[in-house]
């Protein structure tokens, strides 16, 4: 399930216009079969035969795409694909694995590739999740800490640089007995390379302290970690009920290949309550913390597409970030008797409110970032 959000935060109003072209397998209304005698088998229409063929197919895929504009990257030509399938096609009780992928081409030069797969194996005894990305884009650096971030001037000469980087971050989850508890290891390998820093960015104190120069900055990180997860969600990719609670820790150290030694600790709590057909109330509390000799690009971010919408990506960064948020989601329920109603059945909306907190340590809060907005949801499967 993919959705597009248009958000308005209390610090800044950002208008995003995203015309999307949706290519999806058609959904057809049930038609009455041709009249038949008592000793004959009713004939199926071409639409019904196609519907049965699609239902039997293991791999389902959908594509979204089109031009857009974002405050971070300007004009963008983007596309998203969603693939779902069962590892064992003959086991209809098995959870469908989900592989979303996104690609964006920046008209000012650059590309962004991202995937966050969820793979479910036999009996849901074993899962492989992860994050995989490649970016080559123009980005901005606003220093470290709320007091610096909120007043830092964004411009070509003060904050802009060219970023190129890759991340490979799989995690492996094993179910403990017959419980909803999973545990397992994770690996995180990432490389960040900053070039073409702005004229005055090279004099920014935290940039210089980290080792940044007029030629840029680069860092390689290799980490090992663990996860302990409780997951009772009905459908992990788009839950309507249940709870998700995730504890994870990472160690990046020189003896396993990292340029610097530092640690990451994250807690992610989410709860879902069904309020009726295709209506759900969801709320979350998250904390992300880093400790040690933290690289310039590995600080905890507050205000990203994955928590508080509407802020510039990467503007607010420090060693600790905390977010609380609640949102109401609803899809339009139609009888799907016409093609218009079938299309409307894929449309919904979301309204949310929340707040972010950031500081140099988990217990010291220096900045508060309020957030609220409304958005559009599009169901592609």
PLM feature spans:
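Feature captures outer-membrane beta-barrel proteins of Gram-negative bacteria and organelles
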Residues: 77-89, 113-128, 226-227, 264-274, ...
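Transmembrane beta-strand segments that form the barrel wall of outer-membrane beta-barrel proteins
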Residues: 60-69, 94-107, 113, 243-255, ...
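Sequence/structural signature of outer-membrane beta-barrel proteins
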Residues: 84-88, 102-108, 135-139, 190-194, ...
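C-terminal outer-membrane beta-barrel translocator/porin domains of Gram-negative envelope proteins
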Residues: 224, 229, 233-343
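Transmembrane beta-strands of outer-membrane beta-barrel proteins
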Residues: 61-63, 97-101, 126-132, 181-185, ...
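Gram-negative/organellar outer-membrane beta-barrel architecture
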Residues: 53-63, 68-216, 314-315
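Residues that define the transmembrane beta-barrel architecture of outer-membrane proteins
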Residues: 59-61, 73-77, 95-97, 109-113, ...
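Short loop/turn motifs that connect adjacent beta-strands in outer-membrane beta-barrel proteins
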Residues: 47-59, 87-96, 122-127, 177-180, ...
């Amino acid at each position: 399930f993919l959705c597009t959000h248009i958000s308005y935060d209390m610090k800044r109003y950002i208008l995003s216009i995203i015309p999307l072209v949706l290519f999806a397998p058609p959904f057809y209304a049930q038609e009455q079969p041709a009249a038949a005698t008592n000793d004959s088998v009713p004939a199926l229409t071409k639409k019904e035969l196609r519907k049965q063929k699609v239902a039997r197919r293991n791999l389902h895929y959908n594509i979204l795409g089109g031009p857009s504009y974002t405050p971070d990257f300007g004009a963008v030509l983007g596309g998203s694909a969603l693939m779902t399938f069962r590892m064992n096609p003959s086991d209809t009780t098995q959870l469908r694995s989900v592989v979303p992928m996104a690609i964006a081409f920046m008209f000012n030069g650059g590309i962004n590739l991202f995937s966050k797969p969820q793979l479910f194996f036999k009996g849901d005894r074993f899962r492989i999740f992860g994050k995989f990305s490649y970016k080559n884009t123009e980005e901005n650096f606003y220093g470290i800490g709320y007091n610096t971030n909120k007043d830092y001037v964004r411009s070509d000469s003060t904050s802009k640089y060219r970023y190129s980087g890759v991340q490979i971050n799989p995690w492996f989850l094993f179910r403990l007995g017959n419980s909803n508890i999973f545990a397992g290891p994770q690996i995180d390998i990432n490389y960040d390379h900053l070039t073409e820093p702005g004229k005055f960015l090279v004099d920014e104190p935290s940039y210089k302290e980290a080792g940044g120069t007029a030629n840029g900055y680069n860092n390689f990180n290799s980490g090992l970690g663990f996860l302990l997860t409780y997951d009772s969600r009905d459908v992990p990719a788009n839950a309507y009920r249940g709870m998700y609670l995730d504890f994870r820790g990472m160690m990046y150290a020189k003896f396993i290949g990292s340029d610097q030694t530092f640690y990451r600790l994250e807690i992610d709590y989410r709860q879902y309550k069904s309020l009726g057909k295709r209506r759900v109330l969801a709320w979350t509390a998250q904390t992300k913390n880093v400790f040690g000799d933290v690289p310039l690009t590995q600080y905890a971010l507050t205000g990203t597409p994955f928590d508080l919408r509407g802020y510039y990506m990467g503007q607010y960064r420090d060693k600790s970030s905390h977010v609380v948020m609640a949102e109401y989601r609803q899809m339009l329920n139609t009888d799907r008797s016409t093609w218009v109603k079938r299309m409307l059945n894929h449309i919904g909306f979301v309204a949310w409110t929340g707040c972010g907190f950031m500081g140099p340590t988990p217990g010291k809060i220096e900045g508060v970032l309020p957030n609220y907005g409304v958005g559009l949801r599009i169901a592609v499967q």
